[in-house]
Amino acid sequence: VVLDLGNGTFGALQRYLDPFALDGVILSHLHPDHCADFSALTVYRRYHPHPPPGGMMPVYGPPDAAERLIAAYAPNAEERNRTNLSDLYTFRPYGGVTARIGALGILAAPVEHSCEAYAVRISHAGRALVYSGDTGPCPQLVKLATGADLLLAEASWPDRPDNPAGIHLSGKDAGKAA
């Protein structure tokens, strides 16, 4: 799986993994720095001369992910009328229950950011990784991270009392959440 597809991540991904080997996409939120390369993945999957057989790819994200990602891929009405991406993806909004991508359990919790955003807990064989996505300090992240083996947390703010609330973590905030 891939956790977010911000600008430049698709090119980097291809250095290490065939994009057709992906079993799913998990999007924390829909700001471009977390999903801009979804369009690159879509072009690759749609127009590759030798795609593997089968395979709708699940995309987990906020409820409006399908609409927003279709608009990013097909920016005008004529093009949107020709595709809704349902030939490539099954869009699945987070629903507060554990979902599955293969053997992985996926559980998301809403967190505090400037738009609808989620932290995600990925579990397998009794181990768990929690990805914060963009968030300010919040009890939902702490609850989701409790007992996890690893917290992958963004920490964009310096540790200052005048940071805008509910947008990003500082390194100190990330440490407290862990």
What feature does the model see in each segment?
Residues 29-34, 113, 168-171:
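Histidine-centered active-site/metal-ligand motif
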Residues 13, 38-41, 69, 120, ...:
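Generic structural signal for conserved hydrophobic packing positions in ordered secondary structure
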Residues 2-6, 23-29, 33, 62, ...:
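Active-site neighborhood of phospho(di)ester-bond hydrolases with catalytic His/Asp-centered motifs
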Residues 41-58, 123, 163-178:
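P-loop/Walker A phosphate-binding loop and immediately adjacent motor/lid segment at beta-alpha junctions
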Residues 1-18, 90-143:
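Core dinuclear metal-dependent hydrolase active-site scaffold
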Residues 7-58, 147:
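Active-site metal-binding motif and surrounding structural segment of the metallo-beta-lactamase
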Residues 136-178:
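Cap/insert and terminal regions of metallo-dependent hydrolase folds
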Residues 53-116:
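Metallo-beta-lactamase
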